[in-house]
C-alpha cells in the first residue's frame, strides 16, 4: 500500500520555526542572513535528539519486546510510519513487502542522501537476558535490527528539527527481510528510490565493540554469497562422482577456520557444501554456497571453481554446473568513506572510528545490493557494555545491545548525512 500526503515531506510550520529559532541562537550574534554551518546544523539536530532520547530508548525496547520475522514486519513498519509521519516526512509504505521509505526535503535542489535500517528479527529461542525481553515465541532481536531501526527514527528527529535549513534531502529506508537475504532486492524491484536515485546511502550494523566505537573498511568489508549447483547424470558410478566433485570443490576453498577467525585482507573463498542428493533415475547433485570477498571477487570465484570442476571427467556420466549470486558483498566506496570519517571526527568527536582488521568472512549482509545501485558506506557500530559485562555478538544466544549505541549511531550518521549534502 502506498501512502502519500501533499503536506508531508517538508517540516511542519512549528517545527520549522523551532529549527530556525535554534539556528539563530547558534549564530551567536552573527548576521542572521548567513546560512548556518553544518557544525551548527549538527548541534541543533543533536540537541533535539537529546531531548527525545528517553523516547527513542522506549521505542527500541518496544521493538525488542515484539520482534517480527522476515516478511512479517507489520507492527514494526507501523510504528516507524507513525513516528515519521508525525515528524513531517513524506512516507511510502508497503515497499518491497513491509518496507517503509520516508523523505524529508530541506533544499529541494540539494543532494539526496539515504540511510538504510533493517527491521526484521531472528528466528529461534535465544536467552534474551534483558528486562524488555521478547514476548514473541520463536523470534528475537539478536542481530541489532531494533537498534538500527531506532537509529533511523532518531536521525529523523534530528534532521526534522533543522527545518528548511537542511541543505538537501534525506531518504530513510526501513528494510524488511534482511535475515532472509531478500529484502534489499525486493525493495529495489519495487522502485525503492522512486524517480530520483540518492547521491549516497549509509548504514550501520551492530558489532561486538564497546559503545562509542565504530569500525569500517574501504572496498570489500563483508563477504558476498554465491550458490553453486553441480549435477551429474547417466549410467556411471554416481557415488564416486559425487565424492570427487565434493573433493574438487573443497580444494577450491582458500581459507581454513584459523584464517577465517583471523580475518582476511585478500580475496578469499570459503565453501560450505550443504546439500547432496541422488535419485533412481541416474541423477545426482552437489550444492553449496560460496562466501567470498575482495575487489572483483565474483569472476575470481567462478574461475577458480570452474577450473576445479573442468578437470573432472566420469565414464558414462555428464556433469553440469551453475552459479547464482545470493547476496552481494558489502563494498564501501573508498572516497566516500574517507570523507564520512572526517565528518564524524569533526562533528561527533566522541565517536571513535577504527579500521576493521580485514574482510569479514563469516557474515553476509544484503546492504551490498543497495551499493550496487548507489555508492555508499556501512559502518560497524559498537554495542557492547564492558562495565555491565554484556556482549553483542550478532546471532549469539546471549546477545545484548546496549541502549547507549543509539545516540552514538544517530550522532555519527547525522554528521555523515549533513556533510554529504555539501556540494
Model-based region annotation:
Residues 240-251, 255, 381-423:
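His/Asp/Glu-rich mid-to-C-terminal helical/loop segments that flank catalytic regions of hydrolases
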Residues 117, 137-151, 203-209, 371, ...:
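Histidine-centered catalytic micro-motifs
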Residues 63, 102, 115, 145, ...:
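Divalent metal-coordination and catalytic microenvironments
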Residues 247-276, 322, 326-383:
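Active-site-adjacent substrate-binding region
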Residues 28-30:
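C-terminal motif of bacterial Sec signal peptides marking the signal peptidase cleavage site
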Residues 198-331:
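Midchain, well-structured core segments that form catalytic/ion-binding scaffolds
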Residues 35-141, 150-153, 161-166:
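Acidic/His- and Gly-rich active-site-bordering loop/insert found
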Residues 147-220:
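Acidic/histidine-rich catalytic neighborhood of metal-dependent amide-processing enzymes
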Amino acid at each position: 500500500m502506498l501512502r502519500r500526503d501533499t503536506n508531508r515531506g517538508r517540516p511542519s510550520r512549528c517545527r520549522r520555526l523551532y529549527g530556525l529559532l535554534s539556528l539563530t541562537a547558534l549564530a551567536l550574534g552573527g548576521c542572521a542572513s548567513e546560512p548556518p554551518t553544518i557544525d551548527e546544523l549538527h548541534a541543533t539536530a543533536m540537541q533535539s535528539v537529546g531531548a527525545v532520547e528517553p523516547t527513542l530508548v522506549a521505542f527500541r525496547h518496544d521493538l525488542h519486546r515484539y520482534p517480527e520475522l522476515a516478511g512479517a514486519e507489520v507492527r514494526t513498519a507501523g510504528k516507524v510510519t507513525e513516528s515519521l509521519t508525525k515528524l513531517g516526512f513524506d512516507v511510502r509504505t508497503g515497499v518491497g513487502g513491509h518496507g517503509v521509505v520516508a523523505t524529508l526535503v530541506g533544499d529541494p535542489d540539494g543532494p539526496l542522501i539515504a540511510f538504510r535500517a533493517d527491521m526484521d528479527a531472528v528466528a529461534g529461542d535465544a536467552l534474551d537476558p534483558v528486562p524488555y525481553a521478547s514476548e514473541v515465541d520463536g523470534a528475537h532481536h539478536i542481530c541489532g535490527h531494533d537498534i538500527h531501526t531506532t537509529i533511523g527514527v532518531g536521525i529523523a528527529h534530528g534532521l526534522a528539527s533543522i527545518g528548511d535549513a537542511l541543505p538537501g534531502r534525506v531518504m530513510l529506508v526501513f528494510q524488511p527481510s534482511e535475515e532472509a537475504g531478500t529484502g534489499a532486492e525486493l525493495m529495489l524491484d519495487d522502485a525503492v528510490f522512486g524517480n530520483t536515485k540518492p547521491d549516497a546511502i549509509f548504514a550501520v550494523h551492530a558489532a561486538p565493540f564497546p559503545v562509542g566505537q565504530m569500525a569500517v573498511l574501504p572496498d570489500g568489508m563483508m563477504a558476498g554469497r554465491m550458490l553453486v549447483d553441480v549435477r551429474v547424470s547417466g549410467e556411471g558410478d554416481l557415488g564416486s562422482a559425487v565424492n570427487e566433485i565434493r573433493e574438487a570443490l573443497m580444494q577450491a576453498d582458500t581459507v581454513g577456520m584459523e584464517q577465517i577467525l583471523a580475518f582476511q585482507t585478500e580475496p578469499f573463498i570459503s565453501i560450505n557444501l550443504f546439500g547432496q542428493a541422488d535419485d533412481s533415475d541416474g541423477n545426482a547433485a552437489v550444492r553449496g554456497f560460496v562466501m567470498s570477498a575482495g575487489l572483483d571477487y565474483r569472476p575470481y570465484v567462478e574461475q577458480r571453481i570452474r577450473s576445479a570442476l573442468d578437470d573432472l571427467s566420469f565414464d558414462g556420466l555428464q556433469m553440469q554446473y551453475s552459479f547464482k549470486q545470493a547476496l552481494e558483498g558489502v563494498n564501501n566506496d573508498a572516497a566516500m568513506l574517507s570523507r564520512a570519517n572526517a565528518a564524524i571526527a569533526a562533528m561527533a568527536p566522541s565517536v571513535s572510528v577504527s579500521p576493521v582488521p580485514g574482510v569479514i568472512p563469516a557474515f553476509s549482509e544484503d546492504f551490498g545490493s543497495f551499493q550496487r545501485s548507489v555508492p555508499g558506506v556501512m559502518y560497524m557500530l559498537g554495542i557492547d557494555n564492558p562495565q555491565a559485562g554484556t556482549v553483542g555478538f550478532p546471532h549469539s544466544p546471549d546477545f545484548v545491545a546496549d541502549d547507549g549505541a543509539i545516540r552514538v549511531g544517530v550522532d555519527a550518521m547525522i554528521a555523515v548525512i549533513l556533510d554529504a549534502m555539501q556540494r
